[in-house]
Amino acid sequence: MSNAKITELGTQSIRSLLLKYAMPGIIAMTAMSLYNMVDSIFIGHGVGALALSGLTVAKPFMDICAAFGTLVGVGASSLVAIKLGEKDYRSANDILANVILLNVLLGAIIMVVGLYWLDPILYAFGASNETIVYAHEYMEIILWGNIITHIYYGLNSMLRSIGHPRISMYATILAVSLNVVLDPIFIFVMDMGVRGAALATIISQIVSVIVEMIIFLNPKEVIHFHRGIWRLRRDITMRALGIGLAPFLMHMAACFVVIVLNNQLKRYGGDMAIATFGMTNRFMFFFAMIVMGIQQGMQPIVGYNYGANLKDRMIRAFKLSVYCATCVMGILWLFGVVWPEGFIRLFTHDEVLIAQSIAPARIMLCVMFAIGFPMITGNFYTSIGMASKAIFLSLTRQVLYLIPLILCLPLLFELIGCAPIWGVWWALPISDSLSVITAAIVINRDMKKFKN
C-alpha cells in the first residue's frame, strides 16, 4: 500500500472512510456469522438436538482458542495503525513478523494442552454423558488445526490495518464459501457428522491463509515479509500483547461466562436448555458480527487519527460507528421480540425444543437495541491504545455484573416460587443494561478531555 493511501485516513471524510473500511469488514463478518449459523443448521438438522447442544458446549473452548489469536492479532494491528500514523514503517514491518511468530507459538501450546485434557475440559464446560461425544469429535479436529486458525485471524487483522480491507473481506468470504460447500458434503454425503463440520472449517482456513500470505509476500507493499524481521522483539511483543489484552480478556471473560451459564443451564434445564441458548446465541452472533465489522472499519481510522493527534476526526469516527451499531442491533431486537420462532426453526425441527425456546429467546434479546454502544466503546479504547479502560468495560459486564446474576438470580426466583431456570435467562438482559450505563459514564468523561 502506498504512503498516499495510508495518509487518506487523516484527510478524507469520516463518513466515506468508515464506509470504505467498514463495509468489507461488515460483509466479511456477515459471511462468517452466516457460516457459524449454517454450521449449526447442518449439525442440528443432520445430526440432532444433542449434537447441537454438544456444539454449544464446545463453543467456549473454540472461543478461548480464538481469544489467544485476538490477543496477538488485534493488539498488533492496532499498534501497526498507530505506527503508520507516526510514519514508522520499519517498526510496522517488525510487528508483522512478530504476529506470525507469536501465533505459531501460542497456537502450538494451546493445541497440545487442549488435546491432552480435552474431555475434562469439555465436562467442566457443561458437557453431559450424552453430549460429550459430539463435543469431543468436533474439538479434536479444531485443535489439530489451531495454528492455522491463529495465523488466519492474525493476518486478517493486519490486512485491514495496512489499508486492504477488501482483501481481508475476500479472504474471509473465500473461507466461508468453501466451508459452506464442504459442510453438507462431509456431514451428509460422507456421513462424518460433527467431525465433518470441523474438518470443513480447517480446510477453508488453510486456503484463506494461502491467499493472505500472497499479499504479504509482495515487496511493493509498505508492510511485507522480508529478511531481517524474523525475530521476536520483546518491546513489540509486550506492547502488542498489552494493547490486545483488552479484547483478549473480553473474550476470555465471555468464555468463562458461557461456561458458568452452560453449567447453570444444565443444572436447572438440562441439555435442551443449553441447545436453546446455543441457537439464540448463534442468531445474536450474526448481528454482533456485523457490529464487529463496523469496529474493524473504525479501528484504523481511530488509531491513525489518534496517532496523528487529529482528535476531532477520531471523535467523529467513534460517534458514527456507535450510530451504525445501534441501528444494527435494533434490527436484532425487533426480530427477537416479534418472531423468535422464525430463527429457532432454522436450527431444528424438534417441536419440543422449539416450543421451550421461544420465551427464553425473547428474554435474552429484549435489550439488544442498546448493546452496540458498549461494544463500540470498548473497541474504541483498544484502537487508541488505552487497554486498561477497554479491559475495565469488558470485565464489568462479563465478570462484575453477569456472573453474579447468573449465580444468584436462579436462587432468588426459586425463593419467590418461580422456576430457577428463568433467573438464568433474565441475568443476560439485566447485565446488558448495566453495561450500557457503565460505558456511557466512562466515555462521557473522556470525550470532554479529548475535546479540550
What are these regions (language model features)?
Residues 1-22, 80-147, 191-245, 302-367, ...:
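Short alpha-helical transmembrane segments in multi-pass integral membrane proteins
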Residues 9-47, 60-75, 79, 83, ...:
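N-terminal transmembrane alpha-helices
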Residues 20-39, 141, 175, 204-208, ...:
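Transmembrane helical elements of multi-pass membrane transporters/channels
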Residues 34-53, 122-129, 185-192, 255-282, ...:
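Helix-terminus/linker motif at the lipid-water interface of multi-pass membrane proteins
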Residues 49-60, 139, 198, 271-286, ...:
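Small-residue hotspots at the loop-to-helix junctions and early N-terminal turns
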Residues 52-112, 149-168, 276-340, 371-390:
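Small-residue-rich hydrophobic transmembrane alpha-helices
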Residues 64-67, 179-184, 209-213, 285-289, ...:
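Hydrophobic transmembrane alpha-helices of multi-pass small-molecule transporters
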Residues 142-160, 168-176, 197-210, 291-295, ...:
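Short runs within selected transmembrane alpha-helices of multi-pass transporters and secretion channels
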